Amino acid sequence: MKQGKWLDTSISFMSMSGYSAPPIFWVALLLIMVFSLEYQLFPVAGRYDLLYEIDHVTGFAIIDAFMAKGEYRAHALQSVIEHMVLPCLVLALAPTTQVVGLMRSSVAEVMSQNYIRAARIKGLSNREIVTQHVLRNAIPPIIPKVGVQLSSMITLAIITESIFNWPGIGRWLLDALASQDYASIQAGVMVLATLVLTANILSDLIGAMINPLVRKEWYANK
């Protein structure tokens, strides 16, 4: 709510760190050295411990572990979750900080508008101002930009899967490139392109649907 305070400064520092973050493979190796090798909190690589046999029904490790039968299902599910922590953290670190920075800029722009001053003059509390005015006007411009983040996350996923030995479409593409399997390369690129295009279209539509200005234009054109 207040620019220049410790919370606003922390968010600004976090967002700038995301834009100027070191390479993802360096971050991944650093987390492996600290949390896996030094403190032994999380596994180094793989999807789950080799002690458990999980049938590949859906291809999603956490769903397959949940659907597995046997007395060790809970332990297998815990193993899958522990193996997911570091890859998910590495994959989400840079995009999350960038989205937080975009959200901060959007909130700061909304807070400087005249209707926010009018709401304060009316005696509305900070909570009412944030929920009824700030978020409703700050979130819609961010949603299309979040959809654009998907293309960069796919690139990060390819590197993350290779480092953590996690089987996925990114590692599958790298194996196809190594073996010169052009049919698999074409299929993988087509799937990723369709996924990115669909995500961008949906993010634009959702952002337009919840944008008050766009809704007013739609109602006016009816």
Locations of regions flagged by a protein language model:
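Alpha-helical transmembrane segments of integral membrane proteins
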Residues: M1-D8, D55-K222
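Transmembrane-helix boundary motif in ABC transporter permease subunits
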Residues: M1-M16, A28-M33, A157
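Phosphate-coordinating loops and pocket residues in cytosolic domains that bind phosphorylated ligands
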Residues: S12, V44, T131
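Generic hydrophobic transmembrane alpha-helix motif, especially the helices
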Residues: M16-M84
